[in-house]
């Protein structure tokens, strides 16, 4: 009886120790690395900001992201440095980050979270998926809910707007645009614009000046500072006298939660009294 009681006591102590050890492992902050500016913004919006130990070049929002060590840029990924930092989760941009080093990192047992949203709903879904890893899952879910609500408000506000033919201009020499299967085109559509290259089979086609002129856009959407407007107007004059709208570059280009700011900016300019 004493042996049973003693064994039970030891067993209970062991269970408590293991439980405590397991809890401490679970409570240890997850080490996260982001490999693109958009996934960095997603991480902060999902409550994972304090877990980030490194990020990519141009990860500059929110401002504290600028303090993170940079382990990736447009040239590639610093594989050796990432392994040295011992991350447990890597946030990757599918199609933007090279696949081979990501597969090598996965072979080390590192979890890879892929993000490549082409719709506003997919951004919200990415936030919800990140809730699984976040120490603040309610923040991730709240960010997703707020994003959906703000886009729903825009859709309701501009639902009866007569679509205006618009050219989404990315670059000048050469001219690039986007098809209807991208995040940027969806934002344009929500605001009451009609992408003149929506039917392109290529997501990001290079187009000619003549291809644009024949479609007669009333609106040209660009990104950058206000000083770009005059340059674009001069580029198209005298053959095309379309209204030029400029948007905050990071808001519009990054597939992250701040795309709503670009949408609100575009909707306002596209539907003001001067349009």
Curated annotation (Swiss-Prot):
Annotated family: Belongs to the BtuF family.
Parts forming coiled coils: none
Protein name per the record: Vitamin B12-binding protein
Origin organism lineage: Bacteria, Pseudomonadati, Pseudomonadota, Gammaproteobacteria, Enterobacterales
PROSITE patterns: FE_B12_PBP
Subunit (UniProt): The complex is composed of two ATP-binding proteins (BtuD), two transmembrane proteins (BtuC) and a solute-binding protein (BtuF).
InterPro entries: ABC_transptr_periplasmic_BD, ABC_transptr_vit_B12-bd, Vit_B12_bind_prot, Vitamin_B12-ABC_binding
Subcellular localization: Periplasm
Domain Fe/B12 periplasmic-binding intervals: 31-275
Source organism of this protein record: Photorhabdus laumondii subsp. laumondii (strain DSM 15139 / CIP 105565 / TT01)
Keyword Disulfide bond in record: yes
């Amino acid at each position: 009886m004493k042996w049973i009681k003693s064994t039970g006591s030891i067993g209970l102590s062991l269970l408590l120790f293991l439980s405590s050890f397991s809890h401490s492992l679970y409570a240890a902050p997850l080490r996260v690395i982001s490999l693109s500016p958009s996934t960095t913004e997603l991480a902060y919006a999902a409550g994972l900001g304090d877990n980030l130990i490194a990020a990519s070049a141009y990860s500059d929002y929110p401002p504290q992201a600028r303090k993170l060590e940079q382990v990736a840029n447009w040239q590639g990924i610093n594989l050796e440095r990432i392994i040295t930092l011992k991350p447990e989760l890597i946030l990757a941009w599918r199609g933007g980050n090279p696949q081979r080093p990501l597969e090598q990192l996965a072979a080390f047992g590192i979890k890879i979270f892929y993000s490549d949203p082409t719709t506003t709903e997919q951004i919200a879904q990415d936030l919800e998926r990140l809730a699984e890893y976040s120490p603040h899952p309610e923040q991730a879910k709240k960010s997703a809910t707020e994003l959906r609500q703000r886009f729903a408000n825009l859709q309701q506000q501009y639902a009866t707007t007569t679509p205006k033919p618009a050219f989404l201009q990315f670059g000048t020499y050469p001219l690039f645009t986007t098809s209807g299967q991208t995040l940027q085109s969806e934002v344009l559509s929500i605001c009451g614009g009609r992408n003149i290259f929506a039917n392109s089979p290529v997501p990001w086609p290079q187009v000619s000046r003549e291809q644009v002129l024949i479609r007669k856009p009333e609106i040209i959407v660009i990104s950058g500072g206000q000083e770009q407007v005059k340059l674009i107007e001069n580029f198209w004059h005298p053959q095309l006298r379309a209204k030029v709208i400029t948007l905050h570059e990071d808001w519009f280009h990054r597939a992250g939660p701040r795309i709503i700011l670009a949408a609100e900016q575009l909707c306002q300019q596209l539907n003001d009294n001067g349009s």
